[in-house]
Regions:
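Conserved nucleotide-sugar donor-binding catalytic segment
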Residues: 141-231
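A conserved acidic beta->alpha catalytic loop
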Residues: 40-49, 68
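Short loop->beta transition adjacent to catalytic acidic/histidine clusters or analogous donor-positioning motifs
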Residues: 3-6, 27-38, 46, 58-62
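Short, well-formed alpha-helical segments that are part of the catalytic scaffolds
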Residues: 14-28
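Short beta-strand-to-loop acidic/aromatic patch adjacent to the donor-nucleotide binding site
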Residues: 86-98
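Membrane-interface aromatic/basic loop that binds lipid-linked glycans or pyrophosphate carriers
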Residues: 266-326
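Glycine-rich, basic loop-to-helix element that forms the pyrophosphate-binding segment
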Residues: 66-85
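Conserved donor NDP-sugar-binding/catalytic core segment of glycosyltransferases
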Residues: 102-135
């Protein structure tokens, strides 16, 4: 095929239940000038064979099969190393997600408005829920630092999963990992890094779908409150880069209090050791570990609140017991 403008990348591992739908959503794009790179991370189901069947019928598809099992983020970095030199834009589509037909076309329109735009996102569906709402409806392009400040101050989360974002390919340096392999939530942190130097585009259309019943994601991890850890790490790492010093200090303190309050609540639910290992592993990426004394103070505050609000406490306990028996 001729040199493509867009490289679409789908790394996968044992996603045979969803891979066909994912591939067909890319093939159905109204924008046609793309290559599609499917990278099999040592699947033990028939995902690799499914990918090969589609590649046999569509010359735009390349299938790469790894011999060594990689972690998820290593697999993504490995897949991004396979881009054609001619591509100008990169679209990741996770193997259990899919994109709607005008996704690439509408995102490209935004990139074409300004060479300063480094990444573009849009509304997306997480199961049946609309995500990405809150972006100013009269605006499509924001200076990167303004977008980062908005996220830090309000929690406006418009980056979504990797499937919701498209990147300018020049941001992916050959021979260097795109995502930080030490991070638990590498996609959010990568977006924040890019916003320090690049502007942000947003399409006010629903352009992608991410599963909420994803069997490839451990239900245990979903119960670990990953969003709270992600928010805490991003604020601690980036607040001083984008905000005035006094505001940054205040935000970091407030976010720490909120994060430890969530940990305190989970303590009363007798969370297993894997919960604490998960959070300690995440905190280690910013040179921290769980502060036991700070956690104890938050637990005392929670106990006082529970004592002063017996009605709500009883309701919470009943909900917890109901959840454990269903």
């Amino acid at each position: 095929m001729e040199a493509p403008i867009v490289s679409v990348v789908t790394p996968f591992h044992n996603t045979s239940a969803y891979l066909g739908q994912c591939i067909e959503s890319v093939q159905a794009q109204t924008f046609r000038d793309f290559e599609y790179i499917l990278v099999d991370n040592c699947s033990t189901d028939d995902s690799g064979e499914i990918a090969e069947r589609y590649a046999h019928l569509d010359s735009r598809i390349r299938v790469i099969r790894r011999n060594t099992l990689l972690s998820q983020v290593q697999n993504y970095n490995s897949a991004l190393s396979e881009l054609s030199p001619s591509c100008q834009y990169v679209k990741i589509v996770q193997a259990d997600d899919f994109i709607f037909p005008t996704c690439i076309e509408l995102m490209l329109r935004l990139f074409e408005q300004s060479d300063s735009i480094g990444l573009v996102s849009s509304y997306w569906l997480k199961g049946s829920q609309l995500r990405g709402s809150g972006f100013p409806h009269t605006t499509q392009i924001l200076p990167g630092k303004e977008m980062a400040r908005s996220y830090l101050r309000t929690g406006l989360w418009v980056f979504g999963s990797p499937t919701a974002v498209m990147y300018r390919s020049s941001l992916i340096e050959k021979g260097k990992p795109f995502y930080d392999e030490s991070c638990l939530h590498e996609d959010t942190e990568k977006c924040m890094e890019l916003l320090e130097h690049w502007d942000f585009g947003f399409s006010h259309q629903v352009l992608s779908f991410s599963r909420s019943d994803n069997e490839s994601i451990s239900s245990a991890v979903r119960s670990f409150c990953p969003e709270s850890l992600d928010r805490y790490i991003v604020v601690q790492r980036f607040a001083t880069r984008f905000l005035p010093s006094e505001e940054a200090v205040s935000l970091k303190q407030r976010t720490k209090r909120d994060y430890y309050r969530i940990l305190a609540k989970r303590t009363f639910r007798l969370k297993q050791s894997d919960f604490w290992k998960y959070h300690n592993r995440g905190l280690k990426t910013i040179g921290e570990s769980i502060e036991v004394s700070y956690l104890l103070r938050q637990m005392i505050r929670e106990l006082l609140w529970m004592a002063m609000n017996p009605g709500r406490t009883i309701i919470s306990i009943l909900r917890l017991l109901t959840a454990k028996t269903t």
